[in-house]
């Protein structure tokens, strides 16, 4: 640990000159529908409230040894506001000096904030919205620290291919996000020539006419498959699926084996220290969205320290360059892809209490960077 700290100090002292103070903003939504569980009647266990500004504060603290050595003071400006106030709040934060903003927002709100700040001197980090459409929008002042849907679905596809589970039954819920999740998985499956044997919608409405749409035995019958992929972003239906399908097959997607950027049970590459520190300081288990915010703040501080006379434009250029080498406690150095601003990172495939596989899966290679086997590669990417 002492050697690592001295290495950080030497790197900081060798870094080019920069402003002696910087303010990093963290903008989130009060009553974010992704974190608020309003279906208590369903007897779901409600987890502790997700407050990702905790992760932002921890990132600032984690790097304080380095920033102190470099003479940089980092201030965190964390705000949670109603949806109607997001655009104005973002503009006010930038106007008062927070030129670097980490966004913990749903996809539509990320777009609204990006549009409101168009032309402003700001660098936005979309930390938690996975929609691929945000990447293909190619906002010049934005990068994405959290993984895209396609990146996560590619991890599933690699794992299924490595296990020779080639035939997949896809079940899709009624929530608008469910269809997008199923579409992303289908694209990943097609990329690796997996077969979608059928795509079947399910419903939670318990009416006789919906019998085939809410009966698990019927939904999973009359077809052969190696695995079931379920797209159920709220989880009300999917929780009943494991051990109840017509055939004894694994379940992946929204339950069973899930994909994410982080898991508290990950034990390699210094991950236990990250998770334990978060648990101790917040009293809850770290989630993927927490890591996404933590690495976003860590990215920004690293960029600011390493760029002469740092500006949002020059910091983004550094983050998406080969010079950027970020430690995320995942065993490889991380940086952002220049064509879509997406953070290159491994994806963890995990159950509720164990990490089963880390993607890219061994055997999948790329001509320049193995991490680019996940997500839309440069040759297939286009701004839209």
Predicted regions mapped to residue ranges:
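Extracytosolic ligand-binding ectodomains
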Residues: 2-9, 19-384
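Repetitive helical segments and hydrophobic/amphipathic motifs
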Residues: 12-14
């Amino acid at each position: 640990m002492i050697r690592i700290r001295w290495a950080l100090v030497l790197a900081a002292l060798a870094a080019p000159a920069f402003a002696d103070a910087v303010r990093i903003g963290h903008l989130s939504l009060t009553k974010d529908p992704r974190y608020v569980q309003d279906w208590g009647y369903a007897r779901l266990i409600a987890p502790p409230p997700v407050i990702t500004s905790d992760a932002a504060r921890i990132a600032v603290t984690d790097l304080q040894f380095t920033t102190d050595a470099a003479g940089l003071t980092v201030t965190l400006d964390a705000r949670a506001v109603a949806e109607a106030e997001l655009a104005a709040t973002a503009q006010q934060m930038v106007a008062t000096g927070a030129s670097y903003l980490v966004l913990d927002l749903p996809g539509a709100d990320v777009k609204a904030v990006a549009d409101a700040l168009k032309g402003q001197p700001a660098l936005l980090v979309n930390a938690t919205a996975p929609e691929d459409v945000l990447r293909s929008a190619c906002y010049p002042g934005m990068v994405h620290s959290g993984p895209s849907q396609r990146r996560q679905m590619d991890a599933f596809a690699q794992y299924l291919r490595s296990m020779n589970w080639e035939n997949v039954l896809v079940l899709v819920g009624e929530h608008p996000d469910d269809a997008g999740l199923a579409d992303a998985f289908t694209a990943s499956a097609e990329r690796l020539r997996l077969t979608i044997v059928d795509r079947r919608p399910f419903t939670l409405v318990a009416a006789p006419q919906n019998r085939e749409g809410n009966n698990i035995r019927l939904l999973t019958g009359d077809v052969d498959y190696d695995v079931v992929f379920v797209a159920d972003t709220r989880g009300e239906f999917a929780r009943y699926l494991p051990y109840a399908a017509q055939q004894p097959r694994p379940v992946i997607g929204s339950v069973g084996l899930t994909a994410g950027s982080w898991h508290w049970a990950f034990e390699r590459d210094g991950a236990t220290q990250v998770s334990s520190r978060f648990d101790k300081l917040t009293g809850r288990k770290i989630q993927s969205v927490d890591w996404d915010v933590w690495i976003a703040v860590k990215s920004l501080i690293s960029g600011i320290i390493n760029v002469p006379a740092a500006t949002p434009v020059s910091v983004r250029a550094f983050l998406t360059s080969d010079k950027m080498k970020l430690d995320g406690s995942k065993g490889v150095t991380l940086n952002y892809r220049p064509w879509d601003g997406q953070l290159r990172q491994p994806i963890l495939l995990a159950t509720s209490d164990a990490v089963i596989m880390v993607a890219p899966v061994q055997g999948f290679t790329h001509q320049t960077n193995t991490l680019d086997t996940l997500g839309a590669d440069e040759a297939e990417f286009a701004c839209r």
